[in-house]
Amino acid sequence: MKVMTTIQALTAEIQAAKQAHKTIGLVPTMGYLHEGHLTLAQTARAENDLVVMSIFVNPTQFGPNEDFESYPRDLPRDIALAESVGVDLVFAPSVEEMYPQDGGIRIHAGEQATILCGASRPGHFDGVLQVVAKLFHLTLPTRAYFGQKDAQQVAIITTMVRDFNFPLDMRVVPIVREEDGLAKSSRNIYLSESEREEAPAIHEALQLARDSFLATGDVREALAKAKAHIQIQTHGRIDYIELLAYPDLTPVTETTQQVLLAAAVYIGKTRLIDNSIFTVKEGL
């Protein structure tokens, strides 16, 4: 496995792969890899000739009071894990390599970025699109791999791929969970022992809301059940729990067929997200 830190070295490798008519799978990450990331890489390994994993904690997607400086980092560990699942090339640039100049052109994520996580993290998805677009241009992937846990991010990146005519296929891999249902996340390391015991209630709440909505079609009732469960079972603070048409991220209507049930909850100081995407077979 090769590890590269410069754009020049990366693009030379990508051009050689393209000249050899190899398919390229890109797995973008911010590092501190967990089983969810490794599942993305394993899926990419099964479908491509060359698997590229980026490891870059992207400053443009963090707000001024967020955890950019404290975000967990362990590049040697990540490199070993990436190699263990068959990644061919790790691209781990510095901030200066990716953003050599302040200012310049920026991508605006649009209306899809003003709700859910975007409501409490203004500018977050602009930063996500900025780095993902750069990675797409640099790696020229045949396929790009993302996790369902970041469902809003996936929807917004899919819109960018469509609108900017990126010639690639989006691959979305299901959420990987702990045995008690908690979605795997690099931020789970922040949780204290007692907070970790409470955190699975988020997934439980989404299951309750999903069952309620499928039984009654009542959005308010479903969300109320989810909120009540979190309030009873945890000391957490709810950022949002919403039920929307997916991938449009618009209000549910009688013709909605696919639904996103998404939550963000602060357990202690740690903001955790989770979701469920499911089909309403006959519409509402």
UniProtKB/Swiss-Prot annotation:
Binding, (R)-pantoate: Q61, Q153
GO biological process: pantothenate biosynthetic process
Enzyme category, top tier: ligase
Compartmental location: Cytoplasm
Family under the similarity heading: Belongs to the pantothenate synthetase family.
Miscellaneous notes: The reaction proceeds by a bi uni uni bi ping pong mechanism.
Record's protein name: Pantothenate synthetase
UniProt organism field: Lysinibacillus sphaericus (strain C3-41)
Name of encoding gene: panC
